[in-house]
């Protein structure tokens, strides 16, 4: 019996083996495990082994949880949880998946709190698509500090947070009020973190918090300098009460005028005379000792300028008439200048732009500009011809000076500079560089006097066609458009720099002067008023522009030198622009003169009159003088007052010859 049972058992076992299983159920393979590879909050990767390093998670980004295998997406919502550690509050999350369901994207329903620790847990409920398992995992991260924002800013009562320009700030007991988005940490409101800086350093101030530490009042306890730039600074070391971070903040502002004048107030006529006399000193006291010529600028040493010296010669006439010097002194200086010009380098009669005041040798103005400069020569001859007309031919000594001026005048070969008879004048020529500069003189700009004198020359004149085809470019110099409802007859839009209205018209009288292209009084007045109106409108919002502080022309600036104009406005006001425009805008120019002297005199007035330029926006004032800027001030003020230089130049017989030839009327 026992043997029989054994046989049955063996048979049953063999049958089971043949069927592959004794219970008719397939075996399940051992399940794998999911591997967590990365957790990121936005782009900020968490340290999965040391949560204490997770200190700067953003508050406004989703959480990315990356695994090695494809997930069972139906389990994710139950498996992932985010809590606020301090309160246990559960953060609502919405889920999506990336990377072929290997990445969970958990998007918080609201922005996370700043300066808060969060606990992220992933339970073992999470499964892989292949039933891979995952052990419980928990980590923590700390969010970045909150942002401390400036909600409002007023400087001396003026809203300043979103204003393009804060100007006219009071000079005394100035208050700056700042409201923050959060209470600030009082310990961070110290003078090293919050201060106002001026040209002379940090301004003493008091710092007071109010309104539960969310408002800061800065009171400046020292009187500010007028018409100056100041800078409010709040460093990133200013923190909120909960460590909220403030982005380093700066704000410029500009102070108002001081009602107290810098110098005693004098009559308008006395002020005009004072400015003429002080400016004249540039050409008298600072003239080159050997040659009597005008130095290019107050730092030029032996470098003298031909055109600027022409302006200086005109200024000497004013100096004599205004009794700044005697007539004899003026004649002696003219004699010295003529001695120099008669032996200085000339190129077909034209002098170079720059000359060595000791030797008379050319000093190159540029690499290829080492010869005659016809435009500078015309400015020089404008001065010499005017002085010739001032001299008394009945006096033998003065007649000798007249003869010497005529000799120089008659040997300027204006026609040579047509470059072989072309209908245009060329600016430069030198023996070795020849015509390499290739600079045709075409209008409209400061060079009208060059063509006028070329036409007036008794020995080397030009045909009228050179003027009409070259200078006037067959009429293309015309403009005719309106700017600020002011018609501009000639030139580029807005007229260009104001020296266009000065250099040619130091001697050439624009009153009632016209030709086929324009009335030149209208041209110069309208050009000036466009420049003035532009400055008052101040479209670029520069500090310091007003109906008193105006005038754009060529001058020094904080970066070097430029021809400033409404289309090249760099925030630089140049006194010669308004002051040399006295004939064209007497009221506006007088306002500017009083502003320059009484309001800016402490920084702008110097030994030779007003320094070259200033830029209140950048807190800059030039320390330079230029002959071509100082000369027109003396001369055009005199033309405004008496017409002296205009009357003298226009009395020259050659002037009428040129007017007839070119079709001018007066």
Q: Model-derived features: where do they sit?
A:
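Bacterial N-terminal signal peptides that target proteins for export
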Residues: 1-9
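C-terminal motif of bacterial Sec signal peptides marking the signal peptidase cleavage site
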Residues: 18-21
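Acidic, low-complexity Ser/Thr/Gly/Pro-rich repeat segments typical of extracellular/periplasmic
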Residues: 26-260
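Ser/Thr/Asn(+Pro)-rich, low-complexity disordered segments
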Residues: 258-666
